[in-house]
A protein has these predicted regions:
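Membrane-interface anchor segments at the N-terminal boundary of transmembrane helices
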Residues: 70-79, 318-408
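Extracytoplasmic catalytic/substrate-binding loops of multi-pass membrane glycan-assembly enzymes
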Residues: 24-67, 328, 348
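Membrane-proximal stem/loop segments at transmembrane-domain junctions that anchor or position
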Residues: 231-352
Length: 414
């Protein structure tokens, strides 16, 4: 009778998860965002996996024209539903959760998606947006499910599955290098706990080298097939350059030795300064500064820095797209290296502001009340965790709680 009841409840969870995501996939359709064309057009600045996914759907549904994007949205929604369901069912079985608690666990990713759709400025869900987040958020849930399984039981199959998903994530978004840091933390912790440090070091080396080598080869092979150049994607430095320019002052440009690079920096700086994009235009408190940085980050990078560098290089140099993008990267690197010594203290303030912001903000619109709410929640969370460990030891629930807190901290820091 209990098995039948559990089976019926499992079907209910499946229907809730799948029905939720597919409803919005059909109701909203495929959502095109600012970054979407760069993935659709397979631009060299993007990691390979998501453009490859779009290409696959474009080939399979070639007769549908732009309608293939709806197929992508449906696929991403099914992936999101399966990821949420997989994590819920794993935790229900492993932690012996009741039906009510299991339903709450399932609702967490669903309600987060609703916040993205109805409360966040973006006003759409990631699961049906043509963005890397469309698969990355779901893959991260699956990564967490298998890594937590490894942490609790030490199952090598779960670890290597998590490592493979980490490879997929890094090949989708460079920011997902956080999964490697979580993977390393888990292996080190299990090795110390089981007193198998040498074996753990070997496993750690295999996982990290496998992920790094695999992502490098996929990146280079993809660019060779698409552009005829066995090289990695370009423009990674633009993210650092954006923050460097945000924290800079005009006189910092004097440190740039090459005249053309210095003039290029000054032209970019003037546009950003006039638009109020830079750090000195922000408020005094960390909350105001982090809000200002978030509001104007894209204005610096997408609207100003990136177009200025691309236009300058294409006007003054000749060559194929891959070679021109390498020149763009060289200009980026020159600005970063020259300005970094002067802007570094300000850069650290930006970093600290955004770590604090990341610890308290949500996908909802910013409001100061979240700061105090988050302080109370973190304190309560840590107190409850310590109390639980004292009473029950480092059991499955404690491991899940520690993993969640560590994932948040690494995510906001990276």
């Amino acid at each position: 009778m209990k098995k039948r009841s559990d089976a019926v409840f499992g079907v209910l969870l499946f229907l809730i998860s799948m029905g939720f995501y597919l409803f919005f996939a059909f109701y909203d359709g495929a959502v095109i965002c600012v970054d979407s064309p760069s993935y659709i057009n397979m631009e060299i600045s993007r990691e390979p996996l998501y453009p490859m996914l779009l290409l696959l759907f474009r080939q399979v549904f070639s007769s549908a024209g732009e309608g293939y994007l709806q197929g992508v949205a449906i696929f991403q929604s099914i992936l999101a539903a399966c990821a949420a369901l997989s994590l819920t069912c794993f935790l229900r079985k492993e932690l012996k959760l009741g039906k009510a608690v299991s339903l709450v666990v399932l609702m967490i990713p669903l309600l987060t998606s609703l916040l993205c759709r109805f409360a966040a400025k973006r006003a759409s869900m990631y699961s049906n947006s043509i963005l890397t987040e469309g698969i990355a958020t779901s893959l991260f849930l699956l990564f967490s499910r298998y890594l937590i399984d490894y942490c609790i039981k030490g199952k090598k199959k779960a670890l290597f599955t998590a490592a493979f998903i980490s490879f997929l994530l890094i090949s989708t978004r460079k920011q997902m290098v956080i999964t490697v840091l979580l993977l390393i933390s888990a292996i080190v912790w299990r090795s110390i706990r089981e007193k198998t440090v040498k074996k753990g070091l070997l496993i750690l080396t295999v996982c990290v080298l496998g992920i790094g080598t695999g992502s490098y080869l996929l990146d280079c092979s993809y660019n060779y097939c698409v552009r005829g150049s066995f090289s990695r994607h370009a423009n990674d430095d633009r993210f650092i350059d954006t923050v460097v320019i945000y924290a800079s002052e005009k006189e910092d440009g004097e440190a740039i030795k090459r005249d053309d690079t210095r003039e290029l920096f000054e032209s970019i700086y003037e546009i950003c300064d006039e638009g109020g994009y830079l750090m000195h235009s922000a408020g005094q408190g960390w909350y105001e500064r982090s809000a200002h940085f978030g509001d104007y980050y894209d204005c610096i990078q997408i609207d100003t820095l990136w177009p200025a560098l691309e236009q300058y290089v294409r006007e003054h140099y000749e060559g194929d797209n891959a070679s021109l993008e390498k020149i763009v990267d060289d200009y980026n690197a020159q600005i970063i290296v020259a300005l970094m010594p002067d802007v570094f203290p300000r850069l650290m303030r930006v970093f600290a502001d955004n770590v604090l912001n990341g610890m308290v903000t949500t996908v909802a619109k910013k409001t100061p009340v979240l700061v105090w709410y988050s302080v109370v929640v973190y304190i309560l969370y840590i107190v409850l965790l310590i109390t639980h460990v004292k009473r029950n030891g480092l059991d499955g629930r404690a491991i899940l709680a520690v993993y969640t807190l560590l994932a948040v901290m690494i995510n906001v820091a990276v």
